[in-house]
Protein backbone atom coordinates (compact mmCIF):
# COMPACT_ATOMS: atom_id res chain seq x y z
CA UNK A 1 0.00 0.00 0.00
CA UNK A 2 2.80 2.38 0.93
CA UNK A 3 4.44 1.90 -2.49
CA UNK A 4 1.19 2.87 -4.19
CA UNK A 5 0.67 5.90 -1.97
CA UNK A 6 4.20 7.26 -2.23
CA UNK A 7 3.93 8.57 -5.82
CA UNK A 8 0.64 10.24 -4.90
CA UNK A 9 2.22 11.86 -1.86
CA UNK A 10 5.07 13.18 -4.00
CA UNK A 11 2.59 14.56 -6.53
CA UNK A 12 0.65 16.31 -3.80
CA UNK A 13 3.71 17.90 -2.22
CA UNK A 14 5.55 18.90 -5.43
CA UNK A 15 3.94 22.37 -5.79
CA UNK A 16 5.07 23.30 -2.27
CA UNK A 17 8.67 23.23 -3.53
CA UNK A 18 7.93 24.97 -6.84
CA UNK A 19 9.93 28.16 -7.29
CA UNK A 20 7.97 31.38 -7.70
CA UNK A 21 7.83 32.63 -11.30
CA UNK A 22 8.52 36.27 -12.17
CA UNK A 23 7.00 37.13 -15.56
CA UNK A 24 8.69 39.93 -17.50
CA UNK A 25 7.15 41.30 -20.70
CA UNK A 26 9.85 42.62 -23.02
CA UNK A 27 10.61 43.02 -26.73
CA UNK A 28 11.90 40.27 -29.00
CA UNK A 29 15.52 41.38 -29.46
CA UNK A 30 15.97 41.63 -25.67
CA UNK A 31 14.70 38.09 -25.06
CA UNK A 32 16.43 36.55 -28.12
CA UNK A 33 19.27 34.04 -27.72
CA UNK A 34 21.67 36.70 -28.99
CA UNK A 35 20.17 39.43 -26.79
CA UNK A 36 20.95 40.17 -23.12
CA UNK A 37 17.90 38.23 -21.87
CA UNK A 38 19.43 34.74 -21.40
CA UNK A 39 22.49 36.12 -19.54
CA UNK A 40 20.29 38.30 -17.31
CA UNK A 41 17.88 35.41 -16.65
CA UNK A 42 20.77 33.22 -15.50
CA UNK A 43 22.25 35.91 -13.24
CA UNK A 44 18.92 36.82 -11.61
CA UNK A 45 17.83 33.20 -11.10
CA UNK A 46 21.15 32.45 -9.36
CA UNK A 47 20.28 35.11 -6.81
CA UNK A 48 16.48 35.06 -6.45
CA UNK A 49 15.59 31.38 -5.95
CA UNK A 50 12.89 31.92 -8.55
CA UNK A 51 12.22 31.37 -12.23
CA UNK A 52 12.42 34.36 -14.58
CA UNK A 53 10.07 34.03 -17.53
CA UNK A 54 10.64 36.43 -20.44
CA UNK A 55 7.58 36.98 -22.65
CA UNK A 56 8.67 38.57 -25.95
CA UNK A 57 6.61 41.02 -28.02
CA UNK A 58 7.56 42.89 -31.19
CA UNK A 59 8.58 46.22 -29.70
CA UNK A 60 8.15 48.73 -26.90
CA UNK A 61 4.89 50.33 -27.99
CA UNK A 62 3.42 46.83 -28.43
CA UNK A 63 4.22 46.20 -24.74
CA UNK A 64 2.07 49.12 -23.66
CA UNK A 65 -0.70 48.17 -26.10
CA UNK A 66 -0.73 44.59 -24.74
CA UNK A 67 -0.77 45.72 -21.12
CA UNK A 68 -3.62 48.14 -21.78
CA UNK A 69 -5.60 45.30 -23.35
CA UNK A 70 -4.96 42.88 -20.47
CA UNK A 71 -5.34 45.46 -17.70
CA UNK A 72 -5.24 44.14 -14.15
CA UNK A 73 -5.55 40.56 -15.44
CA UNK A 74 -2.11 40.71 -17.08
CA UNK A 75 0.37 38.00 -16.14
CA UNK A 76 3.18 40.55 -16.30
CA UNK A 77 4.97 41.31 -13.04
CA UNK A 78 7.47 43.60 -14.78
CA UNK A 79 7.30 45.37 -18.14
CA UNK A 80 10.76 46.03 -19.59
CA UNK A 81 11.18 48.01 -22.81
CA UNK A 82 8.98 51.08 -22.56
CA UNK A 83 10.81 54.37 -23.03
CA UNK A 84 10.94 58.08 -22.15
CA UNK A 85 8.45 58.86 -24.92
CA UNK A 86 5.83 56.52 -23.43
CA UNK A 87 6.22 57.56 -19.77
CA UNK A 88 3.17 59.79 -19.59
CA UNK A 89 0.89 57.36 -21.46
CA UNK A 90 2.11 54.45 -19.32
CA UNK A 91 1.63 56.40 -16.06
CA UNK A 92 -1.93 57.30 -16.99
CA UNK A 93 -2.93 53.63 -17.29
CA UNK A 94 -2.66 53.33 -13.49
CA UNK A 95 -1.27 49.81 -14.02
CA UNK A 96 2.21 50.43 -12.56
CA UNK A 97 3.50 50.60 -8.98
CA UNK A 98 6.35 52.66 -7.50
CA UNK A 99 9.74 51.08 -8.09
CA UNK A 100 11.50 51.53 -4.77
CA UNK A 101 14.75 52.18 -6.70
CA UNK A 102 16.73 55.27 -5.70
CA UNK A 103 17.23 57.78 -8.53
CA UNK A 104 20.90 58.26 -7.59
CA UNK A 105 21.59 54.70 -8.83
CA UNK A 106 20.84 55.90 -12.37
CA UNK A 107 23.02 57.90 -14.74
CA UNK A 108 21.34 59.07 -17.97
CA UNK A 109 21.70 62.27 -20.05
CA UNK A 110 19.64 65.03 -18.43
CA UNK A 111 19.28 63.08 -15.15
CA UNK A 112 16.32 61.03 -13.94
CA UNK A 113 13.40 61.94 -11.72
CA UNK A 114 10.65 59.32 -11.72
CA UNK A 115 9.68 57.02 -8.85
CA UNK A 116 7.85 54.41 -10.98
CA UNK A 117 9.87 53.81 -14.15
CA UNK A 118 13.50 52.72 -13.89
CA UNK A 119 15.93 53.23 -16.81
CA UNK A 120 18.02 50.23 -17.83
CA UNK A 121 19.82 51.69 -20.87
CA UNK A 122 19.84 54.63 -23.26
CA UNK A 123 20.87 55.46 -26.80
CA UNK A 124 20.34 57.78 -29.74
CA UNK A 125 18.27 57.01 -32.82
CA UNK A 126 20.23 57.06 -36.06
CA UNK A 127 20.17 55.79 -39.62
CA UNK A 128 22.68 52.99 -40.09
CA UNK A 129 24.30 52.26 -43.46
CA UNK A 130 27.02 50.09 -45.02
CA UNK A 131 30.08 52.23 -45.88
CA UNK A 132 31.08 49.80 -48.63
CA UNK A 133 27.77 50.32 -50.44
CA UNK A 134 26.82 53.90 -49.59
CA UNK A 135 29.66 56.33 -50.22
CA UNK A 136 27.64 59.53 -49.79
CA UNK A 137 25.46 59.12 -46.66
CA UNK A 138 23.13 61.98 -45.74
CA UNK A 139 24.63 64.51 -43.33
CA UNK A 140 21.31 65.65 -41.89
CA UNK A 141 17.72 64.54 -41.53
CA UNK A 142 16.74 67.25 -44.00
CA UNK A 143 19.19 65.88 -46.55
CA UNK A 144 17.82 62.35 -46.09
CA UNK A 145 14.28 63.61 -46.67
CA UNK A 146 14.83 66.26 -49.35
CA UNK A 147 17.81 65.07 -51.39
CA UNK A 148 17.15 63.80 -54.91
CA UNK A 149 19.40 60.80 -54.14
CA UNK A 150 17.43 57.57 -54.58
CA UNK A 151 18.24 56.23 -51.12
CA UNK A 152 16.16 53.24 -50.03
CA UNK A 153 15.01 53.58 -46.43
CA UNK A 154 13.40 51.22 -43.90
CA UNK A 155 11.99 52.42 -40.60
CA UNK A 156 9.53 51.18 -37.96
CA UNK A 157 5.86 51.95 -37.33
CA UNK A 158 5.36 54.60 -34.61
CA UNK A 159 2.17 52.83 -33.49
CA UNK A 160 4.00 49.63 -32.51
CA UNK A 161 7.70 50.48 -32.20
CA UNK A 162 9.70 52.81 -29.95
CA UNK A 163 12.30 53.58 -32.69
CA UNK A 164 9.37 54.33 -35.02
CA UNK A 165 7.92 56.69 -32.42
CA UNK A 166 11.41 58.15 -31.98
CA UNK A 167 11.62 59.00 -35.69
CA UNK A 168 8.16 60.57 -35.53
CA UNK A 169 9.37 62.88 -32.73
CA UNK A 170 12.71 63.52 -34.44
CA UNK A 171 10.88 64.64 -37.58
CA UNK A 172 8.66 66.85 -35.45
CA UNK A 173 11.70 68.46 -33.75
CA UNK A 174 13.36 69.21 -37.10
CA UNK A 175 10.32 70.07 -39.24
CA UNK A 176 7.61 71.21 -36.82
CA UNK A 177 4.43 72.08 -38.73
CA UNK A 178 6.09 71.05 -42.02
CA UNK A 179 6.42 67.41 -40.88
CA UNK A 180 3.52 66.10 -43.06
CA UNK A 181 5.25 67.32 -46.26
CA UNK A 182 8.53 65.80 -45.04
CA UNK A 183 6.81 62.44 -44.47
CA UNK A 184 5.42 62.54 -48.02
CA UNK A 185 8.92 63.08 -49.39
CA UNK A 186 10.38 60.30 -47.24
CA UNK A 187 7.57 57.96 -48.35
CA UNK A 188 9.00 58.05 -51.89
CA UNK A 189 12.27 56.57 -50.54
CA UNK A 190 10.66 54.12 -48.11
CA UNK A 191 10.92 50.42 -48.95
CA UNK A 192 8.70 49.32 -46.06
CA UNK A 193 7.61 50.26 -42.55
CA UNK A 194 7.99 47.33 -40.13
CA UNK A 195 6.23 46.56 -36.85
CA UNK A 196 9.46 46.24 -34.89
CA UNK A 197 13.21 46.88 -34.90
CA UNK A 198 14.35 43.26 -35.47
CA UNK A 199 12.46 42.90 -38.74
CA UNK A 200 13.71 46.25 -40.06
CA UNK A 201 17.36 45.58 -39.21
CA UNK A 202 17.16 42.06 -40.63
CA UNK A 203 15.85 43.39 -43.96
CA UNK A 204 18.63 46.00 -44.07
CA UNK A 205 21.30 43.34 -43.48
CA UNK A 206 19.83 41.34 -46.36
CA UNK A 207 20.42 44.36 -48.63
CA UNK A 208 16.79 45.49 -48.88
CA UNK A 209 17.67 49.11 -48.06
CA UNK A 210 20.55 51.60 -48.02
CA UNK A 211 19.62 53.01 -44.62
CA UNK A 212 17.69 51.65 -41.64
CA UNK A 213 16.40 53.39 -38.55
CA UNK A 214 18.38 52.05 -35.60
CA UNK A 215 20.86 53.50 -33.08
CA UNK A 216 24.26 55.22 -33.05
CA UNK A 217 25.45 52.18 -31.04
CA UNK A 218 24.33 49.52 -33.56
CA UNK A 219 27.68 49.49 -35.45
CA UNK A 220 29.34 48.31 -32.20
CA UNK A 221 27.70 44.91 -32.74
CA UNK A 222 29.39 44.52 -36.12
CA UNK A 223 32.73 45.85 -34.82
CA UNK A 224 32.85 43.57 -31.77
CA UNK A 225 30.94 40.45 -32.79
CA UNK A 226 31.74 40.24 -36.50
CA UNK A 227 35.03 42.18 -36.59
CA UNK A 228 33.55 44.34 -39.37
CA UNK A 229 33.86 48.11 -39.44
CA UNK A 230 31.85 48.76 -42.60
CA UNK A 231 28.61 49.67 -40.78
CA UNK A 232 28.19 53.21 -39.50
CA UNK A 233 25.53 55.55 -38.16
CA UNK A 234 25.04 58.70 -40.23
CA UNK A 235 25.81 61.74 -38.05
CA UNK A 236 23.04 64.30 -38.55
CA UNK A 237 23.80 68.00 -38.12
CA UNK A 238 20.45 68.76 -36.45
CA UNK A 239 21.26 66.30 -33.65
CA UNK A 240 19.86 62.90 -32.67
CA UNK A 241 16.79 61.99 -30.67
CA UNK A 242 17.49 60.46 -27.24
CA UNK A 243 15.86 57.23 -26.08
CA UNK A 244 15.93 56.13 -22.45
CA UNK A 245 14.55 52.59 -22.09
CA UNK A 246 12.73 51.82 -18.86
CA UNK A 247 11.08 49.04 -16.87
CA UNK A 248 8.40 49.12 -14.19
CA UNK A 249 6.57 46.66 -11.99
CA UNK A 250 2.84 46.19 -12.37
CA UNK A 251 0.48 47.17 -9.55
CA UNK A 252 -1.41 43.87 -9.95
CA UNK A 253 1.72 41.68 -9.74
CA UNK A 254 1.34 38.49 -7.68
CA UNK A 255 5.09 38.76 -6.92
CA UNK A 256 5.55 42.39 -5.77
CA UNK A 257 8.69 41.74 -3.70
CA UNK A 258 10.38 39.74 -6.46
CA UNK A 259 9.41 42.41 -9.01
CA UNK A 260 10.99 45.10 -6.82
CA UNK A 261 14.07 42.93 -6.37
CA UNK A 262 14.35 42.60 -10.16
CA UNK A 263 14.21 46.39 -10.66
CA UNK A 264 16.95 46.79 -8.04
CA UNK A 265 18.99 44.08 -9.80
CA UNK A 266 18.47 45.91 -13.11
CA UNK A 267 20.70 48.83 -12.06
CA UNK A 268 23.41 46.52 -10.64
CA UNK A 269 26.63 45.56 -12.49
CA UNK A 270 25.35 41.99 -13.08
CA UNK A 271 22.59 43.38 -15.33
CA UNK A 272 24.30 46.52 -16.60
CA UNK A 273 27.41 44.71 -17.86
CA UNK A 274 25.16 42.74 -20.23
CA UNK A 275 23.80 45.92 -21.88
CA UNK A 276 26.67 47.25 -24.08
CA UNK A 277 27.32 43.93 -25.84
CA UNK A 278 23.86 42.38 -25.39
CA UNK A 279 21.42 45.17 -26.15
CA UNK A 280 24.03 47.34 -27.89
CA UNK A 281 23.06 50.45 -25.94
CA UNK A 282 24.69 52.62 -23.26
CA UNK A 283 24.39 51.36 -19.66
CA UNK A 284 22.81 53.53 -16.93
CA UNK A 285 25.32 52.44 -14.27
CA UNK A 286 29.01 53.13 -14.11
CA UNK A 287 30.34 50.06 -15.93
CA UNK A 288 33.30 49.99 -18.31
CA UNK A 289 32.37 50.23 -21.97
CA UNK A 290 34.03 47.65 -24.24
CA UNK A 291 36.63 48.66 -26.82
CA UNK A 292 34.89 49.69 -30.03
CA UNK A 293 32.40 52.03 -28.39
CA UNK A 294 34.86 54.92 -28.72
CA UNK A 295 34.55 54.64 -32.54
CA UNK A 296 30.80 55.33 -32.47
CA UNK A 297 29.05 58.47 -33.72
CA UNK A 298 28.55 60.94 -30.87
CA UNK A 299 25.64 63.33 -31.43
CA UNK A 300 26.61 66.99 -31.14
CA UNK A 301 23.07 67.81 -30.03
CA UNK A 302 20.56 65.74 -28.07
CA UNK A 303 16.93 66.19 -29.12
CA UNK A 304 14.04 65.38 -26.78
CA UNK A 305 10.44 66.32 -26.03
CA UNK A 306 9.13 66.07 -22.46
CA UNK A 307 6.91 63.02 -21.73
CA UNK A 308 3.96 65.43 -21.26
CA UNK A 309 4.55 67.02 -24.70
CA UNK A 310 4.67 63.57 -26.30
CA UNK A 311 1.47 62.48 -24.53
CA UNK A 312 -0.36 65.62 -25.64
CA UNK A 313 0.66 65.39 -29.31
CA UNK A 314 1.47 61.75 -30.05
CA UNK A 315 -1.94 60.78 -31.43
CA UNK A 316 -2.23 63.87 -33.63
CA UNK A 317 1.30 63.40 -34.99
CA UNK A 318 0.66 59.71 -35.71
CA UNK A 319 -2.54 60.66 -37.59
CA UNK A 320 -0.57 63.24 -39.60
CA UNK A 321 2.03 60.59 -40.44
CA UNK A 322 -0.68 58.09 -41.50
CA UNK A 323 -2.35 60.63 -43.78
CA UNK A 324 0.96 61.74 -45.28
CA UNK A 325 2.34 58.29 -46.08
CA UNK A 326 -0.93 56.93 -47.46
CA UNK A 327 -1.24 59.65 -50.11
Show where each model-derived region lies.
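Extracytoplasmic ligand-binding site segments that recognize negatively charged/polar headgroups
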Residues: 21, 25-37, 58-62, 75-209
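Periplasmic-binding protein-like
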Residues: 108-109, 123, 183-187, 193-194, ...
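A ligand-binding cleft/hinge motif common to bilobed small-molecule-binding domains
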Residues: 85-89, 205, 209-230, 279
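Short beta-strand->loop
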Residues: 96-103, 115-119, 142-145, 211, ...
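A bilobed periplasmic-binding-protein/Venus flytrap-type ligand-binding module shared by bacterial periplasmic
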Residues: 126-133, 172, 243-255, 274
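Extracellular/periplasmic bilobal clamshell ligand-binding domains
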Residues: 292-327
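Mature extracytoplasmic/periplasmic domains
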Residues: 250-306
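Short alpha-helix C-terminal cap/hinge motif
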Residues: 38-54
Amino acid sequence: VLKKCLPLLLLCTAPVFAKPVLTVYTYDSFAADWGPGPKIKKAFEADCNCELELVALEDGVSLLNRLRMEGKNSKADVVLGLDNNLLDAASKTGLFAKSGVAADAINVPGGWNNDTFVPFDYGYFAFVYDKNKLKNPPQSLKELVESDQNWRVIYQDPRTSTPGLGLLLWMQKVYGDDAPQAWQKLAKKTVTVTKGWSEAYGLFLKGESDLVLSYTTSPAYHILEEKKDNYAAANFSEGHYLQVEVAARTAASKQPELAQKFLQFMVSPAFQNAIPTGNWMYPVANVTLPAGFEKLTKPATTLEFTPAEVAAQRQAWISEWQRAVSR
